Structures are given as C-alpha cells and as structure tokens.
C-alpha cells in the first residue's frame, strides 16, 4: 500500500479538529483533494457512524465499559475495511481523527478495563494495521475541559461529561503511550496558540515524510 496513514490523538479540548482541518487544507493545496482523505473514529462510514451514535448518546449512561470498548473496536474494524485500506491502496494521505490509542487511553485507563486488555481486544480489529505516524496533541486536563466549556458547550458528548479525574487518567495513559512508542508517536504542546501548534505539526509531518509540506 502506497499511501500514508497519520492519526491524531489527544485529550478532549486539545484542538484536534481545528488542527486537522488546517493540515487537510494545506495538504490538499499541495497534493490535490483526491490525494488527501480525512476520516474519524468512531465513524468514517455508514455503519461506524451508526455505532458512534450509540456510543455518544447522552442517554446511554448505563453502558457497560466492556460494551463500550467492544463497540469502539467494531466501529474501528469496519472503518479500516471500508475506508483506510482502500485509501492506502489508492496512495492517499489519510488524516484520521483518533485510532486505537484512544481506546487504550479512554477505555483501558479511563474506564479501568486495562490498557493491555484493550490492546488485545483491538488486535482482532486492526489485524496489524497501525499509523505510520501519530500526532499526539497534549494539554492539561483542566485547560482542555475549560476550552470545551467555552467553545463547544453545545457539542458535549457522553465522554466529555466525565469527571476531571477521568480525563486526568486518560491524559496520563496517552503520555505513557508516547513514552512507549517514540518511533510512532510525536508529542505536540497543544497549549500553545493554534498557529504555533499547526506549524509544529507540519514540521513533524515533514520530518517523517519529506515529500509533505
């Protein structure tokens, strides 16, 4: 497969969406719109988007943690088969808003299901497919939640509404992943002004893929 698979991770409020949108625009200017694909998890195709609705429905407060983890993995599998593999075979640059690291951090650590256990569950889903590069946008939990309250209070989902300690645990798991997989994960300080964050992300992508930016 000739494409490039780049995932973006980070705690809630890190600004992933804004960063990815700008990166997508600039890569489309460079390569053409047909060579760049934005996608997200859970979601990215009809079936996975339907699973997303179940996962983020604010009324599903009694969802079991393992159910949540398995639904994320199911959505991921369909996403890989329907979107990511065809995109890579077509030689596209894939910008993915969250991938398996999110499950490890949110369900493995945040829900207390075990990071190794969630990784094992997802092996069946990903079948060895991992991003060539993961951009981790790091921000303190308090700052991230404050951003959510100020800028997208009308778009809060079931996971956003978790307590501060949950989000702190998620962040610590992300930092552990960054330490354990330095060959894949690059950390960007997301507390900086958005323009600086974007410049850092572009430089990081260029360092990994010299033909981009």
UniProtKB/Swiss-Prot annotation:
Q: What enzyme category does the UniProt record give?
A: transferase
Q: Name one GO molecular function term.
A: ATP binding
What is this enzyme's catalytic activity, as reactions? dTMP + ATP = dTDP + ADP
Q: What is its EC number?
A: 2.7.4.9
> Which Gene Ontology cellular component terms are annotated?
cytosol
Q: Does the keyword Transferase apply?
A: yes
Q: Which PANTHER family match?
A: THYMIDYLATE KINASE, UMP-CMP KINASE 2, MITOCHONDRIAL
What is this protein for, i.e. what is its function?
Phosphorylation of dTMP to form dTDP in both de novo and salvage pathways of dTTP synthesis.
Protein name listed in UniProt:
Thymidylate kinase
Natural source organism: Limosilactobacillus reuteri (strain DSM 20016) (Lactobacillus reuteri)
